Amino acid sequence: MSHSKSSQRWLKEHFSDPFVKKAQAEGMRSRAAYKLEEILKRDRILRPNMVVIDLGAAPGGWSQQIRKQMGDRGRVIALDIVKMAPLVGIEFLQGDFRDKAVLSQLEIMLKGQPVDLVLSDMAPNKSGMDAMDQPRMMYLAELAMDFADIHVKPGGSFLIKLFHGVGSDDYIRQLRHRYKKVAIRKPLASRKRSPEVYILGDGKLTQNEVSCS
């Protein structure tokens, strides 16, 4: 199939997608907001007054959904390398969270508040070649897990998107040593042919609990 025909097929599918239509109607930045909505309703990990950090947040669909669910209580801090247009009730920090200066700025923003939930919907720009895309995805996932190790408070939660493939099973095993409950989710808004799955770690273990597990 030619590149133009493939692009036309994608565009047709995209604009006929009910979740795309719903996002447009409700003012959501992306259809990904409804993937998160389903997980939040099923697993009930969100409570009022939580502090939530959204990694790789642009264009902001997940941050919007968190703010919608929490109302005007709690804090949502969105973090991304690329610029994100402002959203009401969302604090945005632009930069690479591997950068010490960015992490220092985040600490200033947090003002000592513990983090209840870290989200990561990050994914690499896809080349279409699994041999390249999967390692890149797993690298981002490792960075997000390291970030959550440092920032999520004991008892807190971590939700991340993975591509099912090489390294994903081992990654899930690592999470089982860090959280009391680990669940794999494939929301209805996630296209069936997509390799993406969402992994939820709930009830972060303390260092003593990790040592004993």
Swiss-Prot record:
Positions that bind S-adenosyl-L-methionine: 60, 62, 80, 96, 121
Pfam families: FtsJ
Main location: cytoplasm
GO molecular function: rRNA (uridine-2'-O-)-methyltransferase activity
GO cellular component, one term: cytoplasm
Compartments, record wording: Cytoplasm
Catalytic activity: uridine(2552) in 23S rRNA + S-adenosyl-L-methionine = 2'-O-methyluridine(2552) in 23S rRNA + S-adenosyl-L-homocysteine + H(+)
Enzyme class, broadest EC rank: transferase
Active-site feature positions: 161 (proton acceptor)
EC numbers, comma separated: 2.1.1.166
Keywords in alphabetical order: Cytoplasm, Methyltransferase, rRNA processing, S-adenosyl-L-methionine, Transferase
Family: Belongs to the class I-like SAM-binding methyltransferase superfamily. RNA methyltransferase RlmE family.
Record function comment: Specifically methylates the uridine in position 2552 of 23S rRNA at the 2'-O position of the ribose in the fully assembled 50S ribosomal subunit.
Protein name from the UniProt record: Ribosomal RNA large subunit methyltransferase E
